[in-house]
Amino acid sequence: MPDALQIIVADDHPLFRDAIVLALQASLPGCRTLEASSFSTLEAMVREQDTLDLVLLDLSMPGANGFSSLVFLRGERPEVPVVVISSNDHPRTIRRAQQFGAAGFVPKSSPVAVIREAVQAVMDGGAWFPAQKAERSEEDAQLAARLAQLTPQQFRVLMCMADGLLNKQIAHELGLAENTVKVHVTAILRKLECHSRTQAAVLVKALQAEGGDDAATLPE
């Protein structure tokens, strides 16, 4: 008998998570769902789970910086498809989600049937995005390619750099030796083609999504 599908539902609104879990259980009977309400919780789950089949991701969880959680997932578990479910359905946000590696994008205002359709398409090895998308951005493509060169640990260090932490503070935050952090910072600046920590922080700001903040919208 095949193992049950393991799916993470990452969203900071409990009612929305409940609605998504019910939709998943109806369309994928027997699947095992794990719930994350923050980026730190998601990060821990991804590390702990040997087998993971899908992540449904809200972009605006506490601890996340725009598309940073998506970029982290693609770096940490590139074999696991990610479907972004967001109330920020600006055309450029949808296109950027695709360029940063999402397998699908579903607006939170979508009815349950659409969410199920998107999940099934992705689980079948395909992709699912709304019909109307912004044009491809070469700038975003270059940013995605640079970020893809970072190891998961380097990406964590980069997020700390973007928060203005010094090497000593980053070492304490991540449980690393300060010299190790220095080595990571040097590698990060080289891979991102940046001459300073400030330039690297500006690149992280470029991960911000278009439009306003996400808000919980329950599927119909």
Which residue ranges define each predicted feature?
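Conserved acidic segment of CheY-like receiver
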Residues: 3-16, 20-24, 39, 55, ...
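Acidic, metal-coordinating helix/loop segments flanking the phosphotransfer/catalytic sites
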Residues: 35-54
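Acidic catalytic/metal-coordinating carboxylates
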Residues: 37-38, 62-68
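Active-site residues of response regulator receiver
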Residues: 58-59, 86
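Short amphipathic alpha-helix used as the core "switch/output" element in two-component signaling
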Residues: 67-79, 203
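Short, flexible helix-to-coil linker/hinge segments that flank and couple to helix-turn-helix
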Residues: 94-99, 104-152, 156, 206-209
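Recognition helix of helix-turn-helix DNA-binding domains
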Residues: 164-199
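Basic, Lys/Arg-enriched C-terminal extension of HTH/homeodomain DNA-binding domains
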Residues: 189-220
